[in-house]
């Protein structure tokens, strides 16, 4: 009993350590580049001074620049609230993501707290996140990549638990996971496509095995709707007309393939470890 309590203490100490470390890193990072643009109502040059301005800027951004409505809203909101509050929120998001990855790995909320696994995940995130400062600390970058990953990880957690036979059916759950699916699918493009295809595959698998429950396709449709909202934003086409002038469709596809191949190099050690441990 005493040993279990000590394990819990170490586990929570690791959580607090990661939060404090990330808070200090965020505290040291000043506003930079795009942060100044997003501190203002989009394309107006006027500073955001109210919640109404936050909504107005997000709306203008959606129609003039891109479809990332959730992450842009969060960025505008916390830049208006102030750097201190942003630093706290960003540190919480990073800590939450490590916790969510931990629960995905354990596939159970009730299993023993494993300090070593949690600490290893924190270290792996530090070493393997591509361009760590840009995606986990810089405000305009972290809201796009880190903040979109958290709702996606929450959204996919019930699917992981259900496939592990550790998640019960809940009558109230379909509308909840439908909304989570919208935020997961509408966060950032590559993650939105991933969560949509993954939940589609899980829905099909459960249907074939005759274990399909109502919340499973509900999440898929939510993710699909979020992805459509993200990709069909008028701002995407406005930006493409400006930035994509003189470039063909296949040129953009080639850039994406090259970019994702680069990302694989960052996580290659993790992939090799997984293969060696026969987890994939």
Predicted features and spans:
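Start-transfer (signal-anchor) and selected internal transmembrane alpha helices
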Residues: 1-21
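Transmembrane catalytic cores of multi-pass membrane glycosyltransferases
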Residues: 26-72, 76-81, 88, 139, ...
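Membrane-embedded alpha-helical segments of multi-pass membrane proteins
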Residues: 88-97, 142-155, 196, 264-269
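Transmembrane-helix motifs of polytopic, lipid-linked glycan transferases
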Residues: 91-116, 154
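Membrane-interfacial loop-to-transmembrane alpha-helix junctions, especially the N-terminal start
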Residues: 108-120, 169-174, 211-220, 280
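Membrane-interface micro-motifs in multi-pass membrane enzymes
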Residues: 117-160
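Membrane-interface transmembrane helices that cradle and orient dolichyl/undecaprenyl
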Residues: 152-172, 209-210
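Membrane-interface alpha helices of multi-pass inner-membrane proteins
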Residues: 172-189, 195
């Amino acid at each position: 009993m005493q040993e279990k309590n000590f394990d819990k203490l170490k586990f929570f100490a690791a959580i607090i350590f990661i939060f404090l470390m990330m808070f200090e890193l965020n505290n040291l990072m000043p506003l930079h580049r795009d942060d100044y643009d997003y501190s203002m109502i989009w394309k107006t040059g006027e500073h955001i001074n109210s919640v109404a301005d936050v909504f107005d800027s997000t709306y203008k951004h959606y129609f003039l620049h891109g479809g990332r409505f959730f992450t842009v809203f969060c960025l505008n909101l916390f830049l208006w609230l102030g750097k201190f509050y942003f630093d706290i929120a960003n540190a919480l998001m990073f800590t939450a993501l490590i916790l969510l990855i931990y629960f995905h790995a354990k596939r159970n909320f009730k299993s023993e707290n494993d300090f070593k696994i949690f600490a290893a995940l924190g270290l792996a995130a530090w070493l393997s996140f591509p361009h760590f400062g840009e995606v986990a600390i810089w405000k305009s970058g972290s809201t796009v990549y880190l903040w979109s990953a958290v709702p996606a990880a929450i959204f996919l957690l019930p699917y992981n638990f259900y496939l592990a036979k550790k998640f019960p059916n809940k009558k109230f759950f379909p509308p909840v996971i439908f909304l989570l699916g919208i935020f997961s699918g509408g966060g950032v493009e590559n993650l939105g496509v991933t969560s949509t295809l993954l939940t589609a595959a899980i829905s099909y698998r459960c249907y074939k095995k005759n274990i399909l429950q109502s919340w499973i396709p509900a999440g898929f449709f939510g993710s699909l709707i979020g992805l459509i909202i993200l990709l069909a934003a008028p701002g995407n086409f406005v930006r493409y007309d400006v930035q994509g002038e003189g470039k063909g469709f296949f040129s953009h596809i080639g850039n994406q393939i090259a970019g994702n191949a680069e990302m694989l190099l960052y996580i290659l050690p993790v992939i090799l470890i997984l293969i060696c441990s026969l987890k994939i």
